[in-house]
Amino acid sequence: MGIFKEDLINFGNLIDTEVEVRLLPEDFKRVYPDLDFEFSDRLLRIKGKRKGLLFKRGFEFRGGQDEKRVYNVRGFETEDMGVYLPIISSEGVEELSRKEGMDTEGEHLKLSVFGVLKRSNIYRDIPDAFKDKLVITRYKVRDGYLSVYITVTK
């Protein structure tokens, strides 16, 4: 299901409607080129390389799914939205928290999906008047992709 410009014209009907946006590993690769994302049912693996003295060693972070744990930040110069992934394996958390768009909060990895969402075809089809009114309501880690559910706020 996608958002169409005709649907957005009727703004009142979209306020309570959730739209699923599927974000693929290739979409994440455009924003985080030095990381590999693997999605399986309720499990997200992020693979990367950490710098050593003479060589690079690989790491694999594993995060779970906390479906309702999302964040939406709206400000004068800042705009961000993302998900909180429960940390299953803490390997690589330090390296990931140094990257832009990722941070740790307690036992969760805070992962920004705004950059990935902005590069999606669905986001490009949304009229500019509604782009600043989008919020993430929940997410699901599925086999092969991350489902982000967005809605329009007043």
Regions found by a protein language model. Name each.
Residues M1-K154:
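Extracellular/lumenal and peripheral-membrane lipid-interaction modules
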